[in-house]
């Protein structure tokens, strides 16, 4: 009787490789509508197309908040400024009689000396596109939130301004800021409560909104974080 032959059978294990897509790091423009903005950085450097842009000065954090970071000792201010900035500039210029608004939810931390950083501005510009004074700056100073509002249209660097306390002891908490222009009047609300209302019929310049990190210091580091930023 013939003995059946034994044929060894070997199972070959198949190793499968799957291409796993690498997560692409998010940038501010993936969360915030920045199509109408440009940014000014130390250098000075200007980035006009913010789609897909981020840097050490301007980025999105893990909470998907828009962050502005700056060492105030860096060099490279804009021609008319004493301090460097990481700051957005809205591209639309408008007149005082128009209906305009900026809404922001923002907080700031700093080791600046002096401890003062501007987070929102209405800046002036002349009809022939030359720089004019800022009409309004909303700034954190040693943990308190202030509005600094021009009281004349004098085209001078240190023209008179009114300093208005908006929130005492804010510290590093988030705050909601509404800046509204309507019928020649400026209204500022903090966390939904109206704090300022002024007639600005005296103001002769065109204007535009700014938002970001603009320290009034040359020493220390500042970080400004926006959860929300919209204009109309």
How does the language model describe each region?
Residues 1-11:
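Bacterial N-terminal signal peptides that target proteins for export
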Residues 9-19:
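Bacterial N-terminal signal peptides
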Residues 21-25:
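Sec/Tat signal peptide C-region and signal peptidase I cleavage site
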Residues 26-87:
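Solvent-exposed N-terminal domain segments of exported/luminal and surface proteins
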Residues 28-32, 99-101, 114-115, 200-232:
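Ligand-recognition surfaces built from glycine- and aromatic
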Residues 65-146:
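Secretory/extracellular carbohydrate-interaction modules
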Residues 104, 173-181, 186-188:
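Short tryptophan-centered beta-strand motifs in secreted/extracellular beta-sheet-rich domains
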Residues 147-176:
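Short, aromatic/His-centered strand-loop micro-motif at the edge of beta-sheets
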